[in-house]
Amino acid sequence: VAETTAVPPPRLMKVTNWPMWVIGFTLLIDGMDQYIVRGSSDQIKHAFHVGDTAIGVLFSAFILVNGIVTLPAGYLADRWNRTKAMAVVIVLWSIISAMGGIVPTSAFGLLLVIRASLGFGQAVTDPSGSSVIADFYGTERRGKAFSIQQCLSYVGLGMGLAIGGAIGPLFHGDGWRLAFFVSIVPGLIVAYMCWKLPEPSRGTADRAHVSQSDEMEIASGESPPLFPHGFRKFLGDMVDGLRKDVRTILNIPTMRYALVGVSVVGFVVTAVATWMPNFYQDQLHQSQQAATGTFGALAILGGIPGTIIGGWIADRWVQKFMGARVVIPSVCIAVSATLFMFSFIPMPFGPVFVLQLLGFMSATACVPALRAGLSDAAPAHLRGAGFGAFNLASVVFGSAAAPIVTSAIAEQFGNNYRTAFLIIMPVAFVGTAFLLLARTHIEKDAAKVFEAVVMAMAAQQSEEAAYAAELAARSNNGGSANPSVQSLDEPVEPKGDT
């Protein structure tokens, strides 16, 4: 008869809002670091004697590396200690970012390599952080959790633009060097917070949702070593595992349609976010500081309330019908694209800002619902790979080309970003159509996830019952000849999280 190995019950904790804030701070630091370059781009162009296209390549290199690395990073996020991994990566990217401040002005290629390498950082923190949030918070709280995460991302974006725009012109135009050092100290602080954050067991929020519990399981033990049989064997296993994970993800209809929709929308959003300050400077005749300040204010004043409202709506409406997770983003993106297109019609700055503020608010309202919807549709053990695929689609097939394509179109019309935006913006409606197609599948896909959770909980209860029975037998008999039953005087070695 096959012998069953008993396992101790998991360690439990009540979940507060703190984990969602810590994960959000990682996006704040990342957004600040990215947009410091955007804020001081005029000084960087002057120092290295390059044009808008070269700056577009600088942005695209980061995005492209991010997209390429994010899928294997998502694969690893499903297998390693995510909170510790984020802490280590944030320390490294803070140091690498500062290296950009000492690059000689004759070596634009070196600056390009440094900025591109930072794409590795977000490629790790995004799928890992999103996976952690999905394991800390159940369906009814995920919208709020992802809204906090995204709000802090917009705060970082605004801070980066403001810092870059303010520091860049200092020291006779060499202030851009100092801007690269700004993120070191806050980066180290956030890394420490991630290191101290408990690692939740995978799928614990889903199990708590099914059992109507307010306690979450904390992963016991350390992650298994990544290279127990050598690096070559690890690479082979990772490639095979990625193929299986991607095949599983693409077999989920909700994920298929959502990934296409996200890539299309990501292209438009990145195009606007990268070059909007140039639109203010060239078409509305603002100074560099005013242009970066305007866009930073737009991101914060529109992004934060939009994201909070979107998260609240996502959590409220998902209780009525699961399809709300993809319907809400579709409607929000369509409204946003329409408002932005009207804002590009020649008119005074005041109406332009109001239209874009409402458009930004509508666009950001879609993010919590969309991320929560992907969490609902993807199995817990594949959420890292799922968010990796989400980033891969939005980055490689969408965002990476946006800065270069937009600047190239603008140059064809005499550096007219108004015309470039009017050409690009209608593409967003194609993305909304694909997101709407996901509506008919998300309820079935989410139901399959919870069905698997119920089966896993039944298996876990059997293991815990066996563990309790063995302890009782050991106590009654005063000893055991069964070597699989551990002495009560010895610590029980917990199983690693899988």
Per-segment meaning from a language model:
Residues 3-13, 201-259, 283, 457-465:
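Juxtamembrane intracellular "pre-TM" segments in multi-pass secondary transporters
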Residues 37-38, 247-308, 363-367, 371, ...:
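Extracytoplasmic gate region of multi-pass secondary transporters
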Residues 60-75, 297-310:
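Central cavity-lining transmembrane alpha-helices of secondary-active solute carriers
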Residues 79-90, 315-332:
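Cytoplasmic membrane-interface "Motif A"-like loop-to-helix N-cap segments
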Residues 91-105, 333-347:
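C-terminal ends and interior cores of transmembrane alpha-helices
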Residues 114-155:
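Cytoplasmic helix-loop-helix junction between adjacent transmembrane helices
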Residues 149-202:
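Helix-loop-helix hairpin linking two adjacent transmembrane segments in secondary transporters
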Residues 169-184, 287, 324-327, 408-428:
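A membrane-interface helix-boundary motif in multi-pass transporters
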